[in-house]
Each structure stands twice: as structure tokens, then as C-alpha cells.
């Protein structure tokens, strides 16, 4: 059975046979056996499962998963519904409200965005508990670089959202003459006041999507009570 269960398998499924990925897989087997690692192994590729390749309209690039209990579930910036909204996501909600009048919600579960074609992609897809950056340089970056290359080559253009220096390092892999690139400071409390607040990324994305003849993203998330009927 393929690891990726939709059209992503045709696009990047070959990566799973490459030497770097086989080494990464052995590393992950050891880590999941000997350490507490997030997200759960079954959630590693959720970004791809929720947002098929041909449906990607927007990419919001993160770094590595949240490293606290019950937070990470395979989507960048998103957390499971039952845990507190992380500070960076709170700042994203604040900017959404200022930008588009979107009401902040009482959870951080972003799957409704993913279902609309927003690929919530971290450049590293796993992390040890309480050790940010602990799976950096193990092979994930090569894998997610291929994801970005595949989207860059695709005929249908994509809006790439690059917040902070880590994400902006990927800019050279993106053809800015074909795709939209949105850059600013990261929404982290350490940097949000240095150019994230007031950057209006969400309205820029929707304006561009409409110019492309595509439906805008409905950024308004359901409240937590409604999530259970949403089908989390």
C-alpha cells in the first residue's frame, strides 16, 4: 500500500525509494521506538492526505512540528482541537481579523483550510518531544524540497506564503514569474511586530486567486463545538 494515498504518490512517491529517505526511515524507526516523537507516526503525511496535489492553491510553509503533547498532527501551524491555540497561530488569527474581519476561533485546528487547497507544509515533518529542531538535517528537507519543486513545475500556479527567514530560504526554488510569493516576518511573538502585523497576506491570497479564476479561501474556521460535526 502506498504511503501517500492520492495523486501525491504519482508526483513524489519515488522519493520513498531514494537512499536519503531509506536512511531517514531507519532514523525514524529508532526515534519512534526510543523517544517520544511528534506527530504520531500515522499523522506524518496528513498535509498531503488532506490536500491532494492537483487541489493545492496555497502553500503556507512552516519549520518543524510543535513539540508539546497532543499538539502536532501533520499540518503546519495547526494543533489538535483539544489543546490551547499556540502564540504564532493567535497572531495569525489577529491578522486575519484585521485583514478580512474573520472572527478568531477557540481552537487551532486548521483542517478546514487544508480541505480548501491550502497545503500546510512544514519543511521538517517530525520532532522529539520538547526538542525543537531535533530532526533537522536528517533528510526531511530533501523530501519537502521535492514537494516545492513539484508544485513549482506544475502548470497551475500556486500562492507560496513564506514567513520568516527559514521559509524565505526556499524562495530561490520558486519561479516568481509564474507563482505568487508572499513574504513577511514570522507570526511568532518574537517577530510579528517587525512586519507580520499589517502585511494582509490573507486578502492578498484571495485577491490573487480570484484573478486566477479560482475560488477564494474561506478563512473563517468553525468554532470548536461545530468541529465535531465537521468530521475531524
Curated annotation (Swiss-Prot):
Functional note: Excises uracil residues from the DNA which can arise as a result of misincorporation of dUMP residues by DNA polymerase or due to deamination of cytosine.
Protein family: Belongs to the uracil-DNA glycosylase (UDG) superfamily. UNG family.
One GO BP: base-excision repair, AP site formation via deaminated base removal
Pfam family, one: UDG
Gene Ontology, cellular component aspect: cytoplasm
Catalytic activity: Hydrolyzes single-stranded DNA or mismatched double-stranded DNA and polynucleotides, releasing free uracil
Localization, UniProt: Cytoplasm
Keywords for the protein's UniProt record, in alphabetical order: Cytoplasm, DNA damage, DNA repair, Hydrolase
GO molecular function, one term: uracil DNA N-glycosylase activity
Species this chain originates from: Shouchella clausii (strain KSM-K16)
NCBIfam families recorded: PRK05254.1-1, PRK05254.1-2, PRK05254.1-4, PRK05254.1-5, ung
Active-site feature positions: 64
Gene: ung
Protein name: Uracil-DNA glycosylase
Enzyme Commission identifier(s): 3.2.2.27
Amino acid at each position: 500500500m502506498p504511503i501517500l494515498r492520492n495523486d501525491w504518490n504519482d508526483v513524489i512517491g519515488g522519493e520513498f525509494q531514494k537512499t536519503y529517505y531509506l536512511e531517514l526511515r531507519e532514523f525514524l524507526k529508532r526515534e519512534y521506538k526510543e523517544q517520544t516523537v511528534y506527530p504520531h507516526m500515522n499523522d506524518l503525511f496528513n498535509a498531503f492526505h488532506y490536500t491532494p496535489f492537483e487541489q493545492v492553491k496555497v502553500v503556507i510553509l512552516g519549520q518543524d512540528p510543535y513539540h508539546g503533547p497532543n499538539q502536532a498532527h501533520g499540518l503546519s501551524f495547526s494543533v489538535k482541537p483539544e489543546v490551547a491555540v499556540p502564540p504564532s497561530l493567535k497572531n495569525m488569527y489577529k491578522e486575519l481579523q484585521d485583514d478580512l474581519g474573520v472572527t478568531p476561533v477557540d481552537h487551532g485546528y486548521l483542517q478546514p483550510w487544508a480541505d480548501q487547497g491550502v497545503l500546510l507544509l512544514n519543511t521538517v515533518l517530525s520532532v522529539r518531544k520538547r526538542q525543537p529542531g531535533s530532526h533537522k538535517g536528517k533528510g526531511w528537507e530533501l523530501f519537502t524540497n521535492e514537494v516545492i519543486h513539484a508544485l513549482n513545475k506544475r502548470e497551475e500556479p500556486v500562492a507560496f506564503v513564506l514567513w520568516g527567514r527559514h521559509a524565505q530560504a526556499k524562495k530561490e526554488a520558486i519561479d516568481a514569474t509564474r507563482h505568487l510569493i508572499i513574504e513577511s516576518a514570522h507570526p511568532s511573538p518574537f517577530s510579528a511586530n517587525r512586519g507580520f502585523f499589517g502585511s494582509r497576506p490573507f486578502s492578498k491570497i484571495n485577491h490573487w486567486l480570484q484573478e486566477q479564476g479560482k475560488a477564494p479561501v474561506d478563512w473563517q474556521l468553525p468554532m470548536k463545538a461545530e468541529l465535531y460535526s465537521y468530521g475531524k
